[in-house]
Each structure stands twice: as C-alpha cells, then as structure tokens.
C-alpha cells in the first residue's frame, strides 16, 4: 500500500486570475509563496499557503474549457477549510460579496 502522509496541494484552473487571486489572498487570507507568469503558455501560476503550508496551486489560461457546475458532476466538487465558526465564516464571505450556499452537512 502507498503510504500517504498528507495532501500536498490542490491545483485549480481559474477563468479570472485577478479575481481569483484576490479571493484567495485578500478574502481568505492565503499567503503567496510564489507567483510566476509563464510567457509560453500566456498563463500565471500562483502557489498559495495557509500557515506556511503549501496547499493551492492556482493556474490561469487564456481560454480554459468550461466544466459542468452541477454538484453531482464528476471532478472536484468543493474545497473545505477548517474555521473556528462556520456561521461566522459564511457571514464574512457574504459581507465581502462572495456568493455562498446554505450551510449543510452531508449524511
């Protein structure tokens, strides 16, 4: 069996780089570890951390293909972050004009 130790990082392709960068850094407070513009790909690569732990690799591309947005579609459904209070976190996001779903617990 492969001995996994932890999740190293999650790669996300965004459609609006500046908006996504602002969301992860200014709204969620992730720290920028490294930001690189890759001329050959006309693409940014942004490495982000929570508390010095590298967790998200954010990419931008000129015209990425759309993915289904239905919750039941195959692929990454959501990211979940640990916070002290889910309700307060939801209010904070809404106050920063971030669209959120109602809080629910999977059975």
Short names for language-model regions:
Residues 16-18, 71-107:
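Vicinal oxygen chelate
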Residues 4-7, 76:
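Core-facing hydrophobic residues within beta-strands of well-ordered domains
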Residues 57-59:
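Conserved beta-strand in the GNAT
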Residues 9-11, 47, 78-80:
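Short aromatic/hydrophobic contact patches that present stacked aromatics
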Residues 12-55, 95:
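Core segments of cupin and vicinal oxygen chelate
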